[in-house]
Each structure stands twice: as C-alpha cells, then as structure tokens.
Amino acid sequence: MHSTPTNLMTTASLPVDRPFFAYQHEWNSGARSRNRVLTKMRQAGADFFFAYEALNDALHTGRNQIFLGGTPASALTVKTYMSAFIDQAAAWTHLGKIKSGKAHLELPNGAVIYFIGPESLAAALHGNVYVSEYAWADSPRNMIAIAKGLSMHKRYHATYYTTPSPNPEAWQEYQKLIASNSTTSMTFTADDAAASGATLATGAALFDDEWLNDMKKELSAEDWKMLFMCEWPQADKEQAA
C-alpha cells in the first residue's frame, strides 16, 4: 500500500493566478505522517501555501481545517489568502456558495475552516490543524496542546510550522514533536531557498547570492542563524555545555 500525502493537493480543480514554487510543493508531497513539523526561514511563504493546501483538502474531502495562530489576527491572515484563492478559482470553476463568517469559512460540502488564536474557546472544534509560528507564542506548550486536542481523531493531522525563537519552552516542545514516530520533520533554510532556483513571474530569481549577502549584513550573526538558517539558539548552548 502506497503512502499518501498528508493533505490532498491538486491545482487542477482549484486554479490560481501563479504556480507555487517547487520547494513549497515538497512540504506537501514529503509529508507522510500524522504530524508534520516544518522549521523554516522567515518569509518562506508557508502561510500562503498551507492556506491553499487546506482549502484544497477541505473542498475534496469535506474535512474541517483549523488555523491556530499566536493571535486571532495572525490566523485571520490565512483567511485573506483563502478568500483570494476562492475569487481566482471562480473564474475557472463553480465552487458553489461559500459562507464567510468573521473567523470561519463554510464550504458547500459541509467542511468548515476556522481561524483562531490560543485564547479561543475551541473545545468543540475538530479538524486538520495548522499551527503557525508556535515558537513565538506566549506559550508554545499551550498552543501545541490545543492543536493535539483538535486533531485527535484518526482522520485528522496536525502541521506545526515556525521559525526558531530564543524561547526555551519552544525548543523543548519542538524536540518533543520531532521525537514522535508519527512525525515528518522538514527544514527550509536560506541556503535551501537560494539553491531552489525559485523565480518570480518576471523570471528574476526569488532568492540569490546577492540577497543572501544583503540579509547577512542587516542582521547579527546570531539572528541570521536563528531566523534564516533555522538554528535553535538552545541547541548551540547544549552543545557548548
């Protein structure tokens, strides 16, 4: 029996104005476990891509999707992306009537996509969960505990994606996540970005050596390693101890 991606992903029935980058597709095709942990550099397009992935899966499978952000406002950013995808697809296909609430989207097949923060009363919700930037939350442990409760049923999965932070609690929770046998762990650094060959619609490179050098000059060595090379500061401290 062949393993299947964590979430169904096809651009054929949900067209978008521009294709995603190959490295973003790998976040989907490389995920074969119930839990997916992506440690990524800043501004890698994770919210944007996962918004599409979740919408696609909800339309095809009827599964609920839940975006859990450090604040309700950060989760609602994903709702903006999804609304744009729906508008783009409307020019090519009929998706049916989609109901839009303040913090949710209800699809014609009954699937509901929620956008919540860690203080939300989410006990009654269930679905595939996307946890954005948990390492920068006031309590990473609390966010992850909420996500586990929301995605506990066998047919659901959880995706945790973040840039590393100096928070010791975040480092501890990250280690717990990747230690599980049911977890696929992935990393996407600035070096990976530069090697990806990703280009803009104009044909210009999205990431190149000049960009790498400019960013290194603007940040301290410690911040560069943490924010763009996905190195947890606590890992260096443990190795030095």
Give, region by region, the residue ranges found by the protein language model.
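Phosphate/NTP-binding elements of NTP-utilizing enzymes
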Residues: 2-241
